[in-house]
Amino acid sequence: MTDETNKNGPEAAAPEEFDAAAQPETAEEPEADVSAAAPDPLELAKAENAELRDKYLRLAAEMDNLRRRTERDVKDAKSYSVAGFARDMLAVSDNLRRALDAIPADAREAGDAGLKALIEGVEMTERSMLAALERHGVKQLDPTGQKFDPNFHQAMFEVPNPEVPNNTVVQVVQAGYTIGERVLRPAMVGVAKGGPKAASSEGETPPA
């Protein structure tokens, strides 16, 4: 019996050896290439530099716009802060002019020294007031002979005149004024009617 066991022993063990040999060996996976997946430090630095430069340019542009807006606001505040006061002073100037216009020409010539001194005093006051307003950017409009401009003039009536182009200012009822680039008060005017067509406004300068 021992012989039979010895005889069959190697043959019994053979299938196990065969099975072990038949099983494929587990293949070792290659290590991942870490160096290929890592970002290039130089490219990262370039991208960061480009982003910072873009932020800097945007900030510089915003600061420049803010500076310009601030300068414009300060200039406007300085130029137009006296607009209300100037408008009130123009009403006083209008009354002085009406007082002077109410004096007949013969009374001016034949008047005594007291009347002449009064007239000179009123005229001097009017000139001084207008000069003071002009120092603060208030300028008088003199549109006589100019083409009517609704931005600067207010038409009060029409004057039939075939010799003057249509819509030409032929009479100023009340002077107009500007402050800076804005109209403080439009000039009240009379415009011509019945004449030839007015020339094109191209190339014309703003009313003085």
Swiss-Prot record:
Pfam families: GrpE (PF01025). It is found in: Cytoplasm. One of its GO terms (biological process) is protein folding. GO terms for cellular component: cytoplasm. Residues 1-43 are annotated as: Disordered. Keywords: Chaperone, Cytoplasm, Stress response. GO terms for molecular function: adenyl-nucleotide exchange factor activity; protein homodimerization activity; protein-folding chaperone binding; unfolded protein binding. Its main location: cytoplasm. The keyword Chaperone applies. Signal peptide: none annotated. Belongs to the GrpE family. HAMAP family: GrpE. Homodimer. Participates actively in the response to hyperosmotic and heat shock by preventing the aggregation of stress-denatured proteins, in association with DnaK and GrpE. It is the nucleotide exchange factor for DnaK and may function as a thermosensor. Unfolded proteins bind initially to DnaJ; upon interaction with the DnaJ-bound protein, DnaK hydrolyzes its bound ATP, resulting in the formation of a stable complex. GrpE releases ADP from DnaK; ATP binding to DnaK triggers the release of the substrate protein, thus completing the reaction cycle. This is Protein GrpE. It comes from Sinorhizobium medicae (strain WSM419). The gene is grpE.
